[in-house]
């Protein structure tokens, strides 16, 4: 199936409305101020889930109770008073359905929606000054664990600034200022519409193609198989794909999900690990500055790279389909096809790993690396380990960079789709609900999967190309809060030392969430979710009988993932608007 460029990024919003991801932030943060009044919402979306389906702190107890929470569907607007029923009084107090909204940083009365969250005037001004003046605050004397409240918010400025970032205040919102309302609405409507169309096309295509394959296999069955009564066939199909209940032990659920996870994810990871030993990049190594140094000869295997890439017959066939494009193979088994600055990825399902990678020239000891890394004309970087490289060619347009970044997700997204289809009971959901779950949860699944790419001990991040970069190098390229938050999440998740089985079940729980926006048959999704959570609980209790807190810690990772999803959405939007 042909995938449109940029289509794999549309999981950043599962809402059909023209809405800004930057206006939606997760309430699921243990740093959020919620203690003053449990009945007062701190978001314009006064519901158990925002547009991306983010659970709030108050829902964590319900999540442990197999997520028996209420849901209210809300839609975002592009203006500051984004939710229906939200008003702003003459005194500057923001209210929602008659209830006063509180500042997410200090708990004071919020004056409005500032820099991505509801905040008071004090915290709004504090955050703006901190960013604009690049203030370095005095080190906290309490290990950066100060509790920020209205009465003591000026006591520790470092912790206050940290709290601003943790609840979702956006540096970019301060840096870029305001976009005219009409222009912002036009851009958002245009972008969201295109993203939704392409995403629906991609996910629906994956699911429909799988259905066609199954139909073809069924027609190829022996005659005696085709002549069997339909009710019997239907009964067996239902039995094999329905959510396991009393007929299936929880151990069988665990086994099925673990096999699905291993077959779709772990193989590629092992390939990457095996190749990393022989192709370990040196510190400071980089992608070639000018990709045009390779000969674009259309008549040779690898399109001018035959001297470096010995190719098989299947690879020759692949190159014939994409004639006129450079094809480079990276250690994780993905072939990057470069054509006129655009990238397309092909996973191991399409091509064999039979090509060696061209050695990449590194920096000399005396070369000024920072001047090279930052010489992009002041443009933004998409420094995200889910792209093939943090390097941004200064000669490429923002549109080209966006397409490259989008297409780098294609193999990973396809693996998520394949994993989802093998979760017992997932295929029984309506195709509409399957697509919505995949759109809303793909980034979070990838975040769990790629947590192993973050090495807290070495302070390095491995990108999808298989190359490692130090955190300091990435910061010099423009990496900011998103990378820091991803690193922090990965460090905490890796610290739990989950087994393959536990990671598989947790990944399934992350994907199948009944509180996602746009779900039609909530009861069916909730039943499947309940089955998976019970299986995860059983597995954790079995493997860690003396560490019951691990299950709770895993559930607490769900709102953290929602926050990361929103931050990622905001960064993508900021890049799209200001490349």
From Swiss-Prot:
Residue intervals of the NR LBD domain: 369-579
Similarity comment: family membership: Belongs to the nuclear hormone receptor family. NR1 subfamily.
Basic and acidic residues composition bias: residue spans: 227-237
Complex formation: Binds DNA as a monomer or a homodimer. Interacts with NCOA5 coactivator, leading to a strong increase of transcription of target genes. Interacts (via N-terminus) with KAT5. Interacts (via C-terminus) with HDAC1. Interacts with ZNHIT1. Interacts with SIAH2.
Biological process, per Gene Ontology: cell differentiation; circadian behavior; energy homeostasis; hormone-mediated signaling pathway; intracellular receptor signaling pathway; lipid homeostasis; negative regulation of DNA-templated transcription; negative regulation of inflammatory response
Domain observations: Composed of three domains: a modulating N-terminal domain, a DNA-binding domain and a C-terminal ligand-binding domain.
Key word Protease present: no
Region (Modulating): 1-99
One annotated Gene Ontology cellular component of this protein: nucleoplasm
UniProt binding sites for heme: 384, 568
Localization per record: Nucleus; Cytoplasm
Regulation: The heme-bound form can bind gaseous signaling molecules such as CO and nitric oxide (NO) and NO can reverse its transcriptional repressor activity.
Protein name in UniProt: Nuclear receptor subfamily 1 group D member 2
Residue ranges covered by zinc fingers (NR C4-type): 103-123, 140-164
Record field: compositional bias (Low complexity): 13-54
Alphabetical UniProt keywords: Acetylation, Activator, Biological rhythms, Cytoplasm, Disulfide bond, DNA-binding, Heme, Iron, Metal-binding, Nucleus, Phosphoprotein, Receptor, Repressor, Transcription, Transcription regulation, Ubl conjugation, Zinc, Zinc-finger
Biological source species: Homo sapiens (Human)
InterPro entries for this protein: NHR-like_dom_sf (IPR035500), Nucl_hrmn_rcpt_lig-bd (IPR000536), Nuclear_hormone_rcpt_NR1 (IPR050234), Nuclear_hrmn_rcpt (IPR001723), Znf_hrmn_rcpt (IPR001628), Znf_NHR/GATA (IPR013088)
Residue span of region Interaction with ZNHIT1: 397-579
In-chain residues carrying the UniProt-annotated modification Phosphoserine: 46
PTM note: Deacetylated by HDAC1. Acetylation and deacetylation regulate its transcriptional regulatory activity.
Chain intervals for the UniProt region annotation (Required for phosphorylation by CSNK1E and cytoplasmic localization): 1-60
Function: Transcriptional repressor which coordinates circadian rhythm and metabolic pathways in a heme-dependent manner. Integral component of the complex transcription machinery that governs circadian rhythmicity and forms a critical negative limb of the circadian clock by directly repressing the expression of core clock components BMAL1 and CLOCK. Also regulates genes involved in metabolic functions, including lipid metabolism and the inflammatory response. Acts as a receptor for heme which stimulates its interaction with the NCOR1/HDAC3 corepressor complex, enhancing transcriptional repression.
């Amino acid at each position: 199936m042909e995938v449109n460029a940029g289509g794999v990024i549309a999981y950043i919003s599962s809402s059909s409305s023209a809405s800004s991801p930057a206006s939606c932030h997760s309430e699921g943060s243990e740093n959020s101020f919620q203690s003053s009044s449990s009945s007062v919402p701190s978001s314009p979306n006064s519901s158990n889930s925002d547009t991306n389906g983010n659970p709030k702190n108050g829902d964590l107890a319900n999540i442990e109770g197999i997520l028996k929470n209420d849901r209210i569907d809300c839609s975002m607007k592009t203006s500051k008073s984004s939710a229906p029923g939200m008003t702003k009084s003459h005194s500057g107090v923001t209210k929602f359905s008659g209830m006063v909204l509180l500042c997410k940083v200090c708990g004071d009365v919020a004056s409005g929606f500032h820099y991505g969250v509801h905040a008071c005037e004090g915290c709004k001004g504090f955050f703006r000054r901190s960013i604009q003046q690049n203030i370095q605050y005095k080190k906290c004397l309490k290990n950066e664990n100060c509790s920020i409240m209205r009465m003591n918010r000026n006591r520790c400025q470092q912790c206050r600034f940290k709290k601003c970032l943790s609840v979702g205040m956006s540096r970019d919102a301060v840096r870029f200022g305001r976009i005219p309302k009409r222009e912002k609405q036009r851009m958002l409507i245009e972008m969201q519409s295109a993203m939704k169309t392409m995403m629906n096309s991609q996910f629906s295509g994956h699911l429909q193609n799988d259905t066609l394959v199954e139909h073809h296999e069924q027609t190829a069955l022996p005659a005696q198989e085709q002549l069997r009564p339909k009710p019997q066939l239907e009964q067996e199909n239902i039995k094999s794909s329905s959510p396991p209940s009393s007929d299936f032990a929880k151990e069988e659920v665990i086994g099925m999900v673990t096999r699905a996870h291993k077959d779709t994810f772990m193989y590629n990871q092992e390939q990457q690990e095996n190749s990393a030993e022989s192709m370990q990049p040196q510190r400071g190594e980089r992608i070639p500055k000018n990709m045009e140094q390779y000969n674009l000869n259309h008549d040779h295997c690898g399109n001018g790279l035959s001297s470096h890439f010995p190719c098989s017959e299947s690879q020759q066939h692949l190159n014939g389909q994409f004639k006129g494009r450079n094809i480079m193979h990276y250690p994780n088994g993905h072939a990057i096809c470069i054509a006129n600055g655009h990238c397309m990825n092909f996973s191991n399902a399409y091509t064999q790993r039979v090509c060696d990678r061209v050695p990449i020239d590194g920096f000399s000891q005396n070369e000024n690396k920072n001047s090279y890394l930052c010489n992009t004309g002041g443009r933004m970087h998409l420094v995200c380990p889910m792209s093939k490289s943090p390097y941004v060619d200064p000669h490429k347009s923002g549109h080209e960079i966006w397409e490259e970044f989008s297409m780098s997700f294609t193999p990973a997204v396809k693996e998520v789709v394949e994993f989802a289809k093998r979760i017992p009971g997932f295929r029984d959901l309506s195709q509409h609900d399957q697509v919505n779950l995949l759109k809303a949860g793909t980034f979070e699944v990838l975040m769990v999967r790629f947590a192993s790419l973050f090495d807290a001990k070495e302070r390095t991040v491995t990108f999808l190309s298989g190359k490692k970069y130090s955190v300091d190098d990435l910061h010099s390229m423009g990496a900011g809060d998103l990378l820091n938050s991803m690193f922090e999440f990965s460090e905490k998740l890796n610290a739990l030392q989950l087994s393959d089985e536990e990671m598989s079940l947790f990944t399934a729980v992350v994907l199948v969430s009944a509180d996602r926006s746009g779900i039609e048959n909530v009861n069916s999704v909730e039943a499947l979710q309940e089955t998976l959570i019970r299986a995860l609980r059983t597995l954790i209790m079995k493997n860690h009988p003396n560490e019951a807190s691990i299950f709770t810690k895993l559930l607490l990772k769900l709102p953290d993932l929602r926050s990361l999803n929103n931050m990622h959405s905001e960064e993508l939007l900021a890049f799209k608007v200001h490349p």
